Amino acid sequence: MQSVTVLDFGSQYTQLIARRIRELGIYSEILPYNASPETIREHDPKAIILSGGPTSVYGDSALLPDGGVFMLGVPVLGICYGLQAIAKHFGGEVAGSSKQEFGRAKMLVSHNEESESPLFRNIPDSDVWMSHGDKVVRLPEGFRVTASSENSEMCALESYGSKAALKVYGLQFHPEVQHTLYGKQLLSNFLIDIAGIKPDWSPKSFIGHQIEEIRARAGKDKVICGISGGVDSTVAAVLVSQAIGKQLHCVFVDNGLLRKNEAVKVMNFLKPLGLSVTLADASDLFLKRLDKVASPEKKRKIIGRTFIHVFEQHLNEEKYLVQGTLYPDVIESVSVKGPSETIKSHHNVGGLPKRMKLKLIEPLRELFKDEVRAVGRELGIAEDILMRHPFPGPGLAVRVLGSVSRPRLDILREADEIFIEELKTSGLYQHVWQAFSVLLPVQSVGVMGDKRTYENVLALRAVESTDGMTADWAQLPHDFLARVSNRIINEVRGINRVAYDISSKPPATIEWE
């Protein structure tokens, strides 16, 4: 399977670049900006893309690629900061612009007398999305300008003449953003026409490739899977089951942090999938270890370690553990942006004890959420399972802010059940990517039946997203929110105030902890 390597210079759009490439039917993966040519060569990409980034190529903190990247014999496309890194490397000059460009801009395609740019084949003058304060002010030798804008005379360039064989291209704007009208066509021109990549990546091809890898990795060893009933672990389990059959045994852990009646619901819908599943009730153990623990990072790590402890009690010569880790989990947990900071450890990634007795099989770790659902459909998993909202590995422990206790978990369960029930009744459940309730560690004064109350505050959260990397808060109807609030306050003892979270990601994360 042919692939594309995206070198990440810290852009907020890096993951979007990878997704757009996959939408063209081409597999893509992200590596750090400073990956060595040897490391890149091991991945055998047929093209390389340099992402945007927040720094300046002439600054002290400049992030620059290894020059050997341009000598690997594959086409290279630089986007925004990536274009500026190309210009600097080949001897051009980049400087701060007196007129910065953020948002829509009109791109004018250059019509060169000698030959048209293959990158701009069938691309007319059109709107593009800019996001830069620096610009190329002197063209590197052996390059030509292929497009311009009002404030950027060199908003696209390519190697030419003596350097034509290098096939190096640069765009000052972002083709991966929807506001760039012909962005998808530009990426197609680069990847399919220039790099000659055959679009052969699809859910079906992914499944075939993963089945081969799983069989090769597991051999004849037994494998255990921690299944939660969520989309990720269910798809991972079914995929591994198709690869190794009865070698796989699943354990569903009731950690005491699940939604209302979750254990019964999960066991019921897992039955038709043909999986071997054991229900392990470890709720007392989890809640004991979480007693008086308020730090979200400590809660995540305790839960991760306890999961492994429970799995180890159910081992029967298994050598491997299956996890439904996704690409966003890996990106958020292990920075690929050089100096950027980790946002938070993921339950599947950072919470595992270092001396775990099991080796990992993570068949979905290179997929985004919507791709997992597509793979699930190809595997024949029912739509009502695939369209369940994401549920965090640590469960309600990260939705009860502060210390976790049975009474507080019960309050949250009842409130969350009402919220989800009303979403489904109103036909809104499938229109939001994720919805849940959060029990806050504060109380507020209220009045009920002419009596003063001092009870808990609950926050409702609903977001719209594609893959969880970015998200907008869902603009649910006011009358709907009023109905949910009224039901919760009247039906759930211990809550006298309901708030609605209108924060987007970024700057907020989807979960509160």
Swiss-Prot record:
Superkingdom in the source lineage: Bacteria
Domain GMPS ATP-PPase: 201-388
Pfam families per record: GATase (PF00117), GMP_synt_C (PF00958), NAD_synthase (PF02540)
Catalytic-site annotation from UniProt: 80 (nucleophile), 174, 176
Residue ranges constituting the Glutamine amidotransferase type-1 domain according to the UniProt record: 3-200
Disulphide bonds in the chain: none
GO molecular function: ATP binding; GMP synthase activity
Metabolic or biological pathway: Purine metabolism; GMP biosynthesis; GMP from XMP (L-Gln route): step 1/1
GO cellular component: cytosol
Enzyme class: ligase
Known catalytic reactions: XMP + L-glutamine + ATP + H2O = GMP + L-glutamate + AMP + diphosphate + 2 H(+)
Residue positions binding ATP: 228-234
Keywords noted in UniProt: ATP-binding, Glutamine amidotransferase, GMP biosynthesis, Ligase, Nucleotide-binding, Purine biosynthesis
EC number: 6.3.5.2
Function: Catalyzes the synthesis of GMP from XMP.
Assembly, per entry: Homodimer.
UniProt protein name: GMP synthase [glutamine-hydrolyzing]
